[in-house]
């Protein structure tokens, strides 16, 4: 059963996440996990997956409409707020074959998520845990757990000035760190004001 599920998931990608119920008729608010929004124009049959419990639900989209940066979705058979509440936090998986082809230099969000990020010298920066859409360009959120169990977070714009190479098959990204992060900790405190002037 587990192998069958893994084989099934391998042929699908997460395109959304159920945030919360919407209204009283079984609709839900869904956060998009893909920057290729055309996928939602024809998307019908999906898998709903709860990572914590390992629960999988086959579902079919009845209606979907844009709402701000997310979507309002109604799955067939969901007729109440209680039914919608049961899938809160579930990921929405779509078949790979419904995705539109990519142009050179384009990517899907799922390709970035969980990638390990290294600087050009091979130093480990962290793992991609989220993606921020700014309008002008995407920004990856890179987090790293430190020895004292605190978490260090860096933001890296997905533009050619910072991204050196994508290695999606290896789930790796080579990227330059932001200038202020590179300088941090490498200058004496006496030079603090000079560093701020240089960056601004």
Curated annotation (Swiss-Prot):
What Pfam families does this protein's entry cite? Answer: PRC, RimM
The molecular function terms in GO held by this entry are: ribosome binding
Q: Does the keyword Chaperone apply?
A: yes
Q: What is this protein called?
A: Ribosome maturation factor RimM
**What is known about what this protein does?**
An accessory protein needed during the final step in the assembly of 30S ribosomal subunit, possibly for assembly of the head region. Essential for efficient processing of 16S rRNA. May be needed both before and after RbfA during the maturation of 16S rRNA. It has affinity for free ribosomal 30S subunits but not for 70S ribosomes.
Query: Per its UniProt record, what SUPFAM superfamilies does this chain match?
Result: PRC-barrel domain, Translation proteins
Its domain description in UniProt is: The PRC barrel domain binds ribosomal protein uS19.
Looking at the UniProt record for this protein, which Gene Ontology cellular component terms does it annotate, in alphabetical order? cytoplasm; ribosome
Q: What processes in GO biological process is this protein linked to?
A: ribosomal small subunit biogenesis; rRNA processing
Question: Nucleotide-binding: present as a keyword of the record?
Answer: no
Q: Which UniProt keywords apply?
A: Chaperone, Cytoplasm, Ribosome biogenesis, rRNA processing
Q: Where in the cell is it found?
A: Cytoplasm
- Subunit structure, briefly? Binds ribosomal protein uS19.
Record domain PRC barrel: where: 103-181
- Tell me its family: Belongs to the RimM family.
* InterPro entries noted in UniProt: PRC-brl_dom, PRC_barrel-like_sf, RimM, RimM_N, RimM_N_sf, Transl_B-barrel_sf
